[in-house]
Amino acid sequence: MKERTIQPVNNGLNGNITIPGDKSISHRAVMFGAIAEGKTTIKGFLPGADCLSTISCFKEMGVDIVQNGDEVTVVGKGLEGLQEPKAVLDVGNSGTTIRLMSGILANTPFFSCVQGDASIAKRPMKRVTNPLKQMGANIDGREEGTFTPLTIRGGDLKAIEYTSPVASAQVKSAILLAGLRAEGVTAVTEPHISRDHTERMLEAFGVKVTREGKTVKLAGGQKLTATDVQVPGDVSSAAFFLVAGAIIPNSKLVLQNVGMNPTRTGIIDVLEKMGATFTVEPINEGASEPAANITIETSSLKGIEIGGDIIPRLIDEIPVIALAATQAEGITVIKDAHELKVKETNRIDTVVAELTKLGARIEATDDGMIIYGKSALKGNTVNSYGDHRIGMMLAIAGCIAKGKTTIEDAEAVGVSYPTFFEELQKLAK
């Protein structure tokens, strides 16, 4: 277990930063390239532990993948060309890998066994396995398919019209990917619109996808044609530096090539509502995944209420939004965020526990948290509990805390942002 010590930043964070590739898009680019016909070149790929797990799983199924830093080439096998894996498919810490890949495995007529690390073993899989079983896949796991390891024998699927109880891009994507080889038209309806990277990328690979309000449909039997993918920077990773720029005195940061997919930009809307000073300059209008350069500087923030339709657009950013709220005048209420409980950790509990250790006034609710600003934070020993987003949030908190902050299990940040601590150090000089 590696520790990191964070010292207070006295002269602000200043400079330009290129945000590493979007994790969600990197996963999908590898998966879709693997089941497409032809060669896909991916630029801007995120070489973090999670996305490398996706590469290793598809290599295990016979796909020729070469990764060199942030560039990847995938020689696709087509939908029918994957080979039965001889070994267990290990997804590491990646919930995206196991859930999306389950949709592909469900439509493939071979046997596979999928597992991950201790965190994955606690995450609920029935939200994905139940609809896949309804389509005809034979899936089992611990506690009747609730937890990993999962065994999947796929093939011979029938399309379903599924109403998901949760707004989850992973659930939606698994069903749509299974639907690629199902008989009929597969439809998924959600309570709120979740991130739409799967729909956008399927269209880029030549699949016809229909969107009507909160429902997405696709017909089975469509083929994917290889295409080159340019991955923008990950807005979820950018969020830590957006908040840092706003709350650390004497800061001004320029974040380059930040993905601006409208299903992901809740953090931008929240910072604007809180009163942050920033500008957004679009750089690739017309691309299937829009991006922008964002300049942000130290700001006076105010407490707000966050809930409803915006929650799926910022679910991964809530830990660092909570930190921003500790430095805002007034009370911030975050509600309708039950999904925080089934992330790498129960993020309601971990955010409240760790920020409390630093002196924040924050309390948990059943579906979120209440933060009382403005708090003067004090350095302490805190823990990421193996959750990359908790680790990065605590590092930014350490920058404004009085005295040193020691983060236990700090290496967890490598899941999505391997160079995070180096970037932070560089901007603090």
Swiss-Prot record:
GO terms for molecular function: 3-phosphoshikimate 1-carboxyvinyltransferase activity. Pfam families: EPSP_synthase. Its EC number is 2.5.1.19. PANTHER family: AROM/DEHYDROQUINATE SYNTHASE, PENTAFUNCTIONAL AROM POLYPEPTIDE. Belongs to the EPSP synthase family. Monomer. It is found in: Cytoplasm. It is an enzyme of class 2 (transferase). 3-phosphoshikimate binds at residues 23-24, 28, 168, 170, 316, 343. Pathway: Metabolic intermediate biosynthesis; chorismate biosynthesis; chorismate from D-erythrose 4-phosphate and phosphoenolpyruvate: step 6/7. This is 3-phosphoshikimate 1-carboxyvinyltransferase. It catalyses: 3-phosphoshikimate + phosphoenolpyruvate = 5-O-(1-carboxyvinyl)-3-phosphoshikimate + phosphate. One of its GO terms (cellular component) is cytoplasm. GO terms for biological process: amino acid biosynthetic process; aromatic amino acid family biosynthetic process; chorismate biosynthetic process. Phosphoenolpyruvate binds at residues 23, 95, 123, 170, 347, 389. The active site is at residue 316. HAMAP family: EPSP_synth. The gene is aroA. Catalyzes the transfer of the enolpyruvyl moiety of phosphoenolpyruvate (PEP) to the 5-hydroxyl of shikimate-3-phosphate (S3P) to produce enolpyruvyl shikimate-3-phosphate and inorganic phosphate. Keywords: Amino-acid biosynthesis, Aromatic amino acid biosynthesis, Cytoplasm, Transferase.
